[in-house]
Amino acid sequence: MSDTISKHDLMSVCTVSRETIDRLEVYAGLLEKWNSTINLVSKNTINQMWKRHFLDSAQLWPHIPSETKTLVDIGSGAGFAGLVLAIIGMEKSPNMKFTLIESDSRKCAFMRNVSREINLDVQIITKRIEEVTDIKADVITARALATVSQLLEYSKNILKDNGVCLFLKGNACCDELKIAKESWVFLSSQSQSITHATGCVLRLTEIKYAS
């Protein structure tokens, strides 16, 4: 899949306008520029960034409940998936509040630079996830961050009681779910990733500690 095709796929997956793609192209240009001096993403993925990073992140959008008011992306890195979702949200859900949590100050500086360039209103917190306790999210997202068990630990202090977790996972997802169920009770569903043959979008709801 070429990057050109991936741009069209992104427009189709999220039914976004050319204006949103233009904002993402500004993001892509800054990513390429910054990545030459700061390791934001693997240099091997830059030539396929629209598929490997932008489309991969954007595929979460259709899974976000329409009534969502607050979305928190944990371990945002260079903005995948949270910054991509926030850019889509500018068009699709302008009243939704996005918060991105990332402990690396350089990556946060990059995300703030992107946000300024495209006039994106997003909260970026430079802290470890477990240090953030003063926000509550309807939806928590994460991409390539940790095991399901660890993601639930990260989420427990910031997810609302009726909240939803959306995680991009790889081929170890089923094994991770079995381990997570030793400590947690939840409902889960998986949707095939559109960017990785062995990947999925994992949706968790009704999350509680196992008694």
List the predicted regions and their residue ranges:
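Class I SAM-dependent transferase core
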Residues: 1-68, 72, 105-118
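Conserved SAM/SAH cofactor-binding pocket of Class I
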Residues: 58-142
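Short conserved AdoMet
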Residues: 65-66, 160, 181
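Short glycine-rich anion-binding loops that position phosphate/pyrophosphate groups of nucleotides
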Residues: 77, 145-147, 171-173
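A short helix->loop->beta-strand "cap" motif at the edges of active sites that frequently abuts
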Residues: 95-96, 161-163
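A short glycine-rich, Lys/Arg-flanked "PGG" loop and its adjoining helix->strand segment in the class I
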Residues: 152-162
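Conserved beta-strand signature within the Rossmann-like core of class I S-adenosyl-L-methionine
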Residues: 162-172
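Active-site capping/gating segments
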Residues: 172-211
